[in-house]
From Swiss-Prot:
GO CC annotation: cytosol
Principal location listed in the UniProt entry: cytoplasm
Role summary: RNA chaperone with significant RNA binding, RNA strand exchange and RNA duplexing activities.
One GO term (biological process): post-transcriptional regulation of gene expression
Protein name: RNA chaperone ProQ
Superkingdom field: Bacteria
Keyword terms of this UniProt record: Chaperone, Cytoplasm, RNA-binding
UniProt region (Disordered), positions on chain: 118-146
Molecular function in Gene Ontology: RNA strand annealing activity; RNA strand-exchange activity
Pfam families xrefs: ProQ, ProQ_C
Amino acid sequence: MTEVQKLTNNKEVIAYLVEKFPLCFSLEGEAKPLKIGLFQDLAEALQDDERVSKTQLRQALRAYTSNWRYLHGCKAGAERVDLQGNVCGILEQEHAEHAAQQLAEAKAKVAAMRAAEKAAKPEKKRPARRVAAKGQHAKETTTNKAKVTRKPKVILNAIELASLQKGDSVKVKVGESAKKAIVLEVVKDSARVQLENGLVITVTAEHLFA
């Protein structure tokens, strides 16, 4: 025996009702006003249907008749229909006004919720930006301090190129730092030196220090 797959939510139940009673219920377009007391007819028609319970039918019917599409179609003089789509009454002015009031209240509620959400979003973002900026500033300050701390204070004394000999230890200024080197050869206004890393370069007198 095949197990019956029960419906689990209003959306599924309403879709099932549209399938069973297409002349009464609909998912698109303007919905038709329903017969007064339709729930009883619905409960009797589906009393042996294991897929849906009376409680589910009541909840789904309430959701269907509270939908904006249904309320929009509830105008004075509109024809009410039964499960088979037969006309069984006219929507009275009182009921039409009640439907219009429900529709207006529902729209106002949604508009208020959207406005509240829109107003709340900037409030959440601003502190985050301020914290991020503060954190970034602190990070930059720490980094700058670290850089300043790491820079060694190098004392450089000018040296006469003519006094240099092969094998002398000197300092070569490279950018903002000074690197130790050994003199390999002195030629006119420059000298060939070997840095600690083994690199051999030729530098002019203004870059050589004791």
